[in-house]
Amino acid sequence: MTTSFWPDGYQACFNLSFDYDSNSALIRRAPLDIVAQSRGKFAPNVAIPRILDLLDDLEIKATFFTPGWTIDQFTESCEEIVSRGHEMGAHGYLHERLAEISMESERGVFAKAAASFEKIEVKPEGFRAPYWLISDRTLELVQELGFKYDSNFMVDA
């Protein structure tokens, strides 16, 4: 008989997660492109409510990795995610490319995002880098700042 390393004899598990970017990356890249900006507003106005209803119907909990800017702009939808029992994880502030900024700037991104999470009374346990692009110091910062896990790597180990 094969022994499972999963708890209670389970043979597998999964984690359902979403990157709730809204238009955070678009604001940074194309602040004057109103057509692009309108695409980013689909998430808080249409997608998130539908996803939350579907998850409720299926009795599934998920993680929403969310930039601080999204929390600041769409606070109500973020509070709704939390009120329905889902986890929110940190995802930068304005969807920054962490590998392309200085250590000081990266620390600033984490600090600004933390302030946004404080507004909705959430201390995120997980972190996922925007674009899954980390610097050579990101993981050290994640650990230093007290996150319990990092969600950038795609392995089952």
Label every PLM stretch briefly.
Residues 1-126, 131-157:
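Catalytic alpha-helical scaffold of carbohydrate-active enzymes acting on polysaccharides/glycoconjugates
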